[in-house]
Amino acid sequence: MSKDIEKVLKEGCCSHCGSCVSLDSSGESYMIDTKYGPIPKFSSKSEFPSFINDACPSIGINYPDLYKYFYKNLPKNWLLGSIENVRTGYSSQKAIRKKGASGGVITQTLIYLFENKYIDGAILAKQGIPTPEKARAFIARSVDEIIDCSQSIYIPVSMLDILKDLNPKEKYAITCLPDQSASLRVLQKNMYSPALSIKYVIGPYTGTAIYPEAIRSFLRSKKVRDHDLITSLKWRAGEWPGYLEIKLQSGRIIRTPKVYYNYLIPFFITNTSLQSMDFVNEFADLAVGDAWSPKYENMGGGHSVVVTRTKKMEKIILDMISKDLLKLKKEVY
């Protein structure tokens, strides 16, 4: 076991990515739930490759080296990352746009990849597994399953531990946070076989995440007792920008506009959020974020900033635009 990773865990600095668990050749490591999010649990038989430290976001991923490997050069702008094109817009499909966290672009793109046989499955974060207030990585293998995983999730979800369960004969897309995308690229750089099954990385812009304890703290502020269990939780329900919706066993339903529950951030913000230097998913093929602009907020409906970072993804987005699957406007950057 890496002493550096042991120190990361001891100091409470784990980024919850799950990369180390996927690299354990013994197969005995797994992620456990804690009030500070998922963290790895290792066994005495755990064995890891020499590059494990390089892939750990909490130890620190060498972005300049990774840029030279993946993009073959350094970015012109370190705030924005490598870019093919920047656009704003949304899915042309009203139902997908409405169900998405912003403009439904990620969902629409995943459906396109699946229906056109670019992928056999999409690895997504899904709220409600194994219990309503928790979330897990999930492999969607149908359009309905992809749509069912729409929406944002603001608690840590380990996305890379599932790599060890992938079928080497299949192709996948994955949605993951910036630090997870970078870690995945390190795994690919080191020819880790399961990581090579990931053909497309589609990542959201990421500002802050909060620890799971924030949910119960919020409910206490609404006079909800701890024994009143959660039966459903949606972070961005309803029309964009959405509202937090929590349904309880008692039958009570609590809805709070997104901007109103942001007060939880200073008290429950994750260490990963505080440490992160990447908010725009620099190693995703496609990076998508909310278009937080008074212009778009007044229009309603949900709008996204859509950034293509690789030529293969630019080609896909252009095809989707030509087929009227996406309504996108090119922006100057």
What are these regions (language model features)?
Residues Y63-Y333:
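Iron-sulfur-associated redox domains of electron-transfer enzymes in respiratory
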Residues E6, F48, A101-V105:
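Short, glycine/acidic-rich beta->alpha junctions
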Residues V8-E11:
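Long, charge-dense tracts
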Residues M1-D4, S19-K41, S150-I153, W240-K258:
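Short, charged low-complexity linear segments at domain edges
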Residues C13-K41, P49-Y71:
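Iron-sulfur cluster-binding cysteine motifs and their immediate structural context
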